[in-house]
C-alpha cells in the first residue's frame, strides 16, 4: 500500500515540475501550448508515462509537439534531477492524451441525437 502511495506522490511531483520546466526552461516553439495532464509511474519508479494535451487539433501540430517533447527529454530530466530528491530520475515517455477529444466526440454525438 505504501509503495502505491509513493508512486502516486512522485507522479504528482513530476507532473508539477514538468509543467513548470516546459513553461520556463524549454525554448522549443513546438512545445508551446503543451499541458501535462497526468503522469503514471511504474511500480519501481524507473519509467514515467507522461500524458499531455495540446491546444491545437491539427495533426501536424500534434506530431511536432511529440517530436519537440522527445527532443526536450534530456533537458527535462536534467531539471528534474536538480529539483527532485530521487535516487534515479525515471525515463520519460510522452503520450498524447486522447480523452478530451473522445469526450468532445461523444458530446457531439449526444447533441446530434437530441436534434433528431
Swiss-Prot record:
Record's keyword annotation contains Cytoplasm: yes
Protein's recorded name: Ribosome-binding factor A
Entries under InterPro entries matching the protein: KH_dom-like_a/b, RbfA, RbfA_dom_sf, Ribosome-bd_factorA_CS
Subunit-structure text: Monomer. Binds 30S ribosomal subunits, but not 50S ribosomal subunits or 70S ribosomes.
Pfam families membership: RBFA
Keyword list, A-Z: Cytoplasm, Ribosome biogenesis
Subcellular location per the Swiss-Prot or TrEMBL entry: Cytoplasm
Amino acid at each position: 500500500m505504501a509503495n502505491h502511495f509513493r508512486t502516486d506522490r512522485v507522479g504528482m511531483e513530476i507532473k508539477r515540475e514538468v509543467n513548470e520546466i516546459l513553461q520556463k526552461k524549454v525554448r522549443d516553439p513546438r512545445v508551446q501550448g503543451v499541458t501535462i495532464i497526468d503522469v503514471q509511474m511504474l511500480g519501481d519508479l524507473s519509467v514515467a508515462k507522461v500524458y499531455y494535451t495540446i491546444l491545437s487539433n491539427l495533426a501536424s501540430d500534434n506530431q511536432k509537439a511529440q517530436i519537440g517533447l522527445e527532443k526536450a527529454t534530456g533537458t527535462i530530466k536534467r531539471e528534474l534531477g536538480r529539483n527532485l530528491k530521487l535516487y534515479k530520475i525515471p525515463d520519460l515517455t510522452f503520450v498524447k492524451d486522447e480523452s478530451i477529444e473522445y469526450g468532445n466526440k461523444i458530446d457531439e454525438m449526444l447533441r446530434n441525437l437530441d436534434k433528431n
